[in-house]
A protein has these predicted regions:
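Short, small-residue-enriched loops and turns at beta-alpha junctions
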Residues: 29-34, 84-86, 143, 248-251, ...
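Histidine-centered active-site/metal-ligand motif
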Residues: 25-29, 104, 108-111, 169, ...
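Acidic/His- and Gly-rich active-site-bordering loop/insert found
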Residues: 2-104, 113-116, 120-129
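Non-cysteine beta-strand/loop elements that form the S-adenosyl-L-methionine
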Residues: 79, 88, 193-195, 351-357
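Metal-dependent amide/peptide-bond hydrolase catalytic core
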Residues: 218-396
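Histidine/acidic-residue-rich, glycine-tolerant segments that coordinate divalent metal ions
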Residues: 85, 91-103, 110, 116, ...
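Divalent metal-coordination and catalytic microenvironments
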Residues: 26, 47, 78, 108, ...
Length: 396
């Protein structure tokens, strides 16, 4: 076995208890998007104890350079997100959230502690590789406009510019000990839709004297689904979902207006723009044709996430070296959004999945739920894997 590979594996195992301790500290002290002040302080302290210098960016983010021999030969970036969610944790564990109403329910505590472990490993062996590893500890993945977009605007991908960037995310549907990859299109763009349908309210017994916004809204919801089924290229995944409709009328009261909220997800930027334009035109036109009006607002979210095929193939091969072929799986397209996507439109990128599921331990709950947790044995190999992927790419 490659001596450096064996060393990285051994170091990852040796620091696993420390990695778990870091994860538990972060889990117990979660902070919301753009508010990761104490998280930044903790991560910075951990890095400084390793002898690494940190540069603050995007208010609560950090950039760290680990330079090997001949630092300018090649640069590879590794990214972890650090923010938590507005969820009340129901887990009965020693590391339960101590911040009321805030919880690490999406594994960002895992991502951050894992990247700290990778930093620890890479810093110990920096005399054994050529090039530079650039670490991005990023705030605010969970909230638009996304910490990644701010990091990029403030120069996270410059000075030095990485040849590629890697990111990992926990996967509740993948057993612990396994890793998932997908080439090309992987995750969707996500835009939030806010519609206000206005009519004329009145008594439910006299609809002829009203302009019923509930009927108008119902037609709009159904008709907009036809944009997905009839106007979209059938080879491109896309989803339109309405999750909230609010009329505030009563059994005998027709309201003045109805509010509708939903999301539009796509895997192609041209179709994303075209679909949104068609939806706006349809909603406004249909409301007008029925005597009402519609205000159509879009909160633009993240672009679709595309994994560079060549880089992803190399990372999958390196993961097989580290984990064994039986523990590296292929992923399906996932229609959720992720702000790592911003990086993928600026530099070659690979976003992969770290399995954390363990049915025997009852670790089966999904992300963004109050009882989400992980099998912490994932932190025995997670830091080493990311370090090895970076080293492999430096040598490619």
């Amino acid at each position: 076995m490659n001596a450096l590979l064996q060393q990285v594996k051994e170091l990852s195992n040796q620091i696993s208890s420390q990695t778990i301790q870091r994860r538990r500290h972060l889990h117990a002290h979660p902070e919301l998007s753009f508010q990761e002040v104490e998280t930044q302080k903790y991560v910075k302290q951990q890095l400084q104890e390793m002898g690494l210098e940190c540069k603050e960016i995007a208010d609560t983010g950090l950039i760290v350079l680990i330079e090997g021999k001949n630092p300018s030969k090649k640069v590879v970036a590794l990214r972890a997100d650090m923010d938590a969610l507005p969820i009340i944790e129901t887990n009965d564990v020693p590391y339960k959230s101590q911040n009321p109403g805030v919880m690490h329910a999406c594994g960002h505590d895992v991502h951050t502690s894992s990247l700290l472990g990778s930093a620890q490993i890479l810093n110990q062996i920096k005399d054994q590789f050529e090039g530079t590893i650039k670490l991005l500890f990023q705030p605010a993945e969970e909230k638009a406009p996304g910490g990644a977009s701010i990091m990029i605007k403030e120069g996270a991908l410059e000075n030095p510019k990485p040849a590629g960037i890697l990111g990992q995310h926990v996967a509740t549907n993948i057993p612990v000990g396994k890793i998932g990859f997908r080439e090309g299109m992987y995750m969707a763009s996500t835009d939030e839709l806010y519609l206000t349908v206005k009519g004329k309210g009145g008594h439910g017994a006299m609809p002829d004297l009203c302009i019923d916004p509930i009927v108008i809204a119902s037609h709009i919801i159904v008709a907009m689904q036809q944009i997905i089924s009839r106007n979209k290229n059938p080879r491109l995944p896309s989803v339109l979902t309405f999750g909230k409709i609010e009329g505030l009328g009563a059994t005998n009261v027709i309201p003045n207006e109805v509010k509708i909220q939903g999301t539009f997800r796509a895997m192609d930027e041209e179709w994303r723009a075209e679909g949104l334009a068609k939806m706006k035109k349809l909603a406004e036109g249909m409301a007008e044709s029925m005597g009402g009006s519609c205000e159509f607002e879009v909160l633009k979210g993240y672009p679709f996430l595309q994994n560079n095929p060549e880089l992803t193939r190399r990372m999958k091969a390196a993961a097989i070296e580290f984990m064994g072929e039986e523990n590296v799986i292929d992923l399906d397209i996932w229609m959720a959004g992720e702000d790592f996507a911003f990086y993928t439109h600026h530099v070659d990128a690979c976003f992969y999945r770290l399995g954390i599921r363990n049915e025997e331990k009852g670790i089966v709950n999904g992300v963004h739920t109050p009882n989400f947790d992980i099998d912490e044995t994932a932190l025995q190999h997670g830091p080493g894997l990311m370090a090895w992927l970076a080293l492999s790419e430096l040598n490619s």
